[in-house]
Every structure is written in structure tokens, then in C-alpha cells.
Amino acid sequence: MKVYLGIDTSCYTTSLCLLNEQAAVLADERRILTVPEGKRGLSQSEMVYQHVRNLPELTEKIASYVAGNTVCAVAVTDKPRRRDDSYMPAFLSGLGCARSLAAMLNVPLYRLSHQENHLLAAWRAVGKEPKEPYCALHLSGGTTDILRVETDGDSTVITRIGGTTDISAGQFIDRVGVALGLPFPAGKYVDRQSLTALGEVNGFPVWHRDGSISFSGRESHIQRLITAGETSCEIICAQTMHTVLNGILELLDTALAGNEYKTVVAVGGVMENNFLRTSVEAAMRRRRIEFIPAPQGFSADNASGAAFKALREYHKAGI
């Protein structure tokens, strides 16, 4: 059986994924990087160190799924975004591993950005991207972007049309979570706490202008509430999630105002959040916009988009 390997070494997860000819996941191995308690992140050198340790172990785990099959192509993320000024050492870990494997196996190696990996993780479940331009919402620990995506023949053009001017939605949530004593990354813990809040909870308005939003002021406000100690953890978490939602909806309102897009794709680790996922879906339904989130479990960092890239490019090349 022909199989396709994807590799992604992002800021906080080492990921390998193996797909078959039908783009079904045969193996999905991930390891979240270890962040010391109370810390809000890692340095790039720490990320590289952990990726270098994780890659051989995850490769050994995935090897049993490769046995008896033929790896036809490998794809790897090599930078955060498909831009000349986009660079992050963490991705060199995966790139080095992918180059070595592709050379040893004598198979093609394809590169893509981490952002493209996220988008393809969503489209893998659908099968193919639309011919007309679509709108993408990328929400993760380091990114809050609204994108215009257009597939033109063999190339995909991604243009940022909006997003945050300061901290991302993921950073906002993580900073609040760590201040509350929750583990980092804090997204799933803040999500769980928010769902237990009693009574009606509203978020705070978010500054917005011409497709840009700012979360830093609201993060500072919520940090002051935490310091004051008069608001429960559950309420703080719910207020944070509702505030993030307010920002997301402002971005989407601006992007969709011209009625250019029929489809919105939502990707990134923050979109694993149950409240945000269902709320954005409901908002798009009211607008009669097709809403395509990455499959549950594949919004967070993973390598399924890279593996899907390997499969598609291999068939395009007619090898």
C-alpha cells in the first residue's frame, strides 16, 4: 500500500502523520513540548532541543505502520507562514529529519508553511479546496489571522486581510490561564472552567478598526480582576472566552462585509475550544456561510495537512 508522511515541528508540538491513498489517517503521533510550571512558553533553543529528542522516538512509533507499505513522498513544514520574512528555528528540526528520511527512501520531499499545514488539515476531510477564493480564520497560540485564500492551478495564494495588532487569541487565553494557576498551554483548561460558570456571563468589547483588533488591553483588565481576587476562576475563564469571541466576530464581520466569500475555514489550536467552535459555527449559519472547521482533534498542531500535501503533490507530479 502507498503511504504518505507529514512532519511538523511547531512551537509546542512535535508531530508525525501517515496517510493512505484515500487520505485516511493510518498513524498520528504527537508530543507536546514540556513547559516548566508557571512559565508562559519556551525559547527557540529549548524548542529545538525537545524536537530533536522527540523526532526519533515518534519515528520509531510510526515505523510499525510503515512496515510492509511504500512511503511515496514526504512533506514537512519549514516556516510559520509562506513569506520571505517568515522564519523560526523550531521548524529546522523537522526539516532536517524530513530531508534525511526522503533522501534515504529516495522519495520526493515537499515543503509547506505551518499555516498551510493547518489549512490542508481542514481540507483533507472535505477532499479538495473550492475553486473560488475563500476566507480562513487561523487562531493559535501565536496567530490570530483572517486570510484570503485562492487556489490558482498548482499554487495557493494566501493574503492576510485582518487579525490582531498585538497578542494573539491563544496568548490571551494562555496568559489568563497561567495567572489562574492552570497548566500551559492553558486553552483546554480555561475552556473547561468556563463551561462551569454559573449565570449569564458576558465578555468585554474589543478594540477594532479596518480588520484589525487588539486583545492586550482586555488581557490587562482581566489580569487586574485576577489580582483583585473578587471574581471566581470560572467567571474569569468565561469572560475571557466571550471576549475572544467578540474579537473573532469583529474580524469576520469586516472580512465578510463585501459578500465575496461563500466559505469560511477555521483552523488552529484555539478552534479546538468547544465554546468558540460552536459559537462561530452558529454565527456563520446565520449568515448562510459554509463553515468548515478542521476535524475535531486536528485543529491543534498536527502533521495531517503536511501528509495530505505529500499525497496531492505526488499525484500532481504523476510519479
Where are the regions that the model predicts?
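Short beta-strand-loop/turn "lid" adjacent to the catalytic site in phosphate-handling enzymes
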Residues: 60-98, 103
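Conserved phosphate-binding catalytic cores of ATP/NTP-utilizing and phosphoryl-transfer enzymes
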Residues: 1-2, 107-135, 308-310
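Short glycine-rich, Thr/Ser-proximal phosphate-binding strand/loop in the N-terminal lobe
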Residues: 10-49, 155-160, 293
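Glycine-rich phosphate-binding loop plus the immediately following alpha-helix
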Residues: 113-116, 150-198, 220, 225-229
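Glycine-rich phosphate-binding/hydrolytic loop that grips phosphoryl groups
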Residues: 118-121, 294-319
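A contiguous, well-structured pocket-lining segment that forms one wall/lid of small-molecule binding clefts
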Residues: 188, 192-264, 270-287, 311-317
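Gly/Thr-rich phosphate-binding beta-strand-loop-beta motif of the actin/hexokinase/Hsp70
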Residues: 1-26, 133-150
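Glycine-rich beta-strand-to-loop/alpha-helix junction loops that act as flexible
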Residues: 76-79, 140-142, 265-273
